[in-house]
Amino acid sequence: ESRGLGDVYKRQPLFCFPTVASNCASVTAISVIYNPDGSFREYYYPKNANHTFIESSIIADSPEELLWAGIGDALSKECEAVFASKEDELSHTPMMGVQLSKICTTPLVEYGKKALDDLRANKVSYELEQVALDIIISTGLVSNMVSAAPKYYYNSSLAHCVYYGSTVTKGGEKHLHGEIVSLGVLCCLLYTSDA
C-alpha cells in the first residue's frame, strides 16, 4: 500500500526532481490516494521534500499539455485558499499561506502564454521559468502552509471538488487534473462573485 511506502520515506531524506511543471507535488507534503477505480479516496501527509531540484531545460522539453494543466491547477490556489478560509480567524501559518496564495495568479496570467509558446519551441526563457517556479514552488509552499488537517484545511475547496467529482464519472480519466481544476476555478470565481 502507498501509505506503507510513505512511512518509509518519513525516515529518509527526500529529494525531488520534477521533469514537468504540471503541479506542486514535488514540494507539497500532500499525497492524493485514489481507489482502484480511479475515484478519490483520501489525502495522505507523509512529508515534504528536503529539497526540490528544477532543471529548466528539462521543463522546456516536457509535453505542452502538462504545462497547460499545471497553469490550470495553479490558478486554483488563490481562489480556493481565500474562499475556504474567509470565515475563520487564521493563525500565523495559514494566514501566511493565504497571503502567499495571492501572488500565485499574477505570474500565470502575465507570463503563461509566452511560457507555453517557449515550451512549444523547447526554449528556456524567463517567462517559462517564472511559470514553472510558480506552479511547482509557490503553490507547493501554499499547500504546505494551509493544510494542517484536522486543525484546518484551506488547500482544496470548490475548484478541486469539481475535479474529484469527475473521478467518479465515465470518461473523467480522459482529462488531466489541471484541465478539470481550471473549470473548477471558473465555478469558484462565479460562486464567490469574483468572475
Residue ranges and their predicted role:
Residues 1-9, 191-195:
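Single conserved hydrophobic/aromatic residue that forms the stacking wall/gate
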Residues 10-101:
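A glycine/threonine-rich phosphate-anchoring loop and its flanking beta-alpha core
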Residues 16, 53, 158-159, 194:
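Alpha-helical architecture
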Residues 90-193:
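Active-site segments that bind and position negatively charged phosphate/pyrophosphate groups
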